[in-house]
């Protein structure tokens, strides 16, 4: 199969302005390629979905980032039989950072992800092929925070107060890529997390260090299935799909990696690793 691609407008349940999302999904149509902004997707715009019922995966981008930066993961998973929805978080994206690094962003982000799942399931084209019994989440950096809150993590504010997020019981597995876990260091922050987790950290990540991630994961309940992989030589931004050549420069950190790290090669293996984990985690109970 190949990947189709559509753009959706997501309605926020709190009455705020709608926000955009990109959806990739399985199709049997040949790949024509689609350009969104400066980025190329190996996906056919508005292609007919393949017949069947496919797991739904929400991908949450990092703080101040973009929902267009995880193309390698989204395209691979869609072609492998997943419906992928990647929302742009209002107030915490590349064009609007008014809520970045705030408790408000921490409160809102899990709701945005849940509304994105709702939108796919309710869509007249995608809903019939989306399997509501197999839902998962992938998140990078602050998106990893989002995914962890979705599966029951209780975040705490910098001032020491619980942030009243809501878990989404539909989400049965989560992949956390260089996740922001300092929100979950208070006692029992992860006491209600029971779904399988795949956590992938960068050895040379100085933004969300493997040490802080390990400290937070130590709070998971005994028996929770968690795998922590530390990628040798990887930095914080190594989890972003390689940027087009004209965007790669030393003064644009998201396009750079620690010396010697092969981001292009990593993004051949990373989507496969994620797919293997999700296939097992979402297998029929």
Give the positions of each predicted feature.
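Short alpha-helix in the alpha/beta-hydrolase fold that links the catalytic acid
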Residues: 189, 195, 209-219, 243
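Alpha/beta-hydrolase active-site loop
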Residues: 102-132
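Short beta-strand/loop motif that positions the catalytic acidic residue
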Residues: 193, 199-201
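Gly/Ala-rich beta-loop-alpha elbow adjacent to hydrolase catalytic centers
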Residues: 139-143, 147
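Cap/lid segment of the alpha/beta-hydrolase catalytic domain
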Residues: 35-38, 64, 68-71, 88-108, ...
């Amino acid at each position: 199969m190949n990947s189709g691609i559509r753009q959706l407008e997501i309605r926020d349940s709190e009455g705020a302005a709608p926000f955009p999302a990109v959806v990739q999904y399985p199709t049997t149509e040949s790949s024509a390629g689609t350009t969104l902004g400066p980025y190329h997707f190996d996906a056919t715009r508005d292609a007919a979905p393949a017949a069947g019922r496919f797991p739904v995966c929400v991908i949450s981008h990092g703080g101040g980032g973009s929902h267009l930066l995880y193309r390698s993961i989204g395209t691979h998973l869609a072609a492998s039989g997943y419906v992928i929805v990647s929302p742009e978080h209002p107030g915490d994206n590349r064009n609007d950072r008014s809520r970045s690094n705030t408790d408000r962003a921490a409160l809102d982000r899990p709701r945005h992800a849940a509304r994105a799942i709702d939108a796919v399931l309710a869509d007249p084209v995608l809903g019939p092929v989306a399997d509501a019994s197999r839902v998962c989440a992938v998140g990078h950096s602050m998106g990893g925070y989002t995914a962890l809150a979705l599966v029951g993590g209780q975040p705490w504010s910098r001032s020491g107060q619980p942030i009243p997020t809501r878990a989404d019981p539909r989400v049965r597995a989560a992949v956390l890529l260089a996740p922001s876990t300092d929100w979950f260091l208070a006692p029992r922050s992860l006491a209600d997390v029971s779904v399988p987790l795949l956590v992938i950290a960068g050895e040379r990540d100085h933004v969300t260090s493997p040490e802080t991630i390990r400290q937070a994961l130590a709070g998971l309940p005994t028996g929770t299935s968690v795998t922590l992989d530390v990628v040798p030589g990887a930095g914080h931004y190594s989890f972003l799909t390689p940027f087009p050549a004209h965007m790669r420069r030393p003064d644009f950190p998201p396009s750079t990696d620690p010396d010697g790290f092969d981001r292009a090669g990593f993004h051949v293996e990373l989507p496969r690793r994620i797919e293997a984990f999700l296939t097992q985690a979402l297998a029929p109970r």
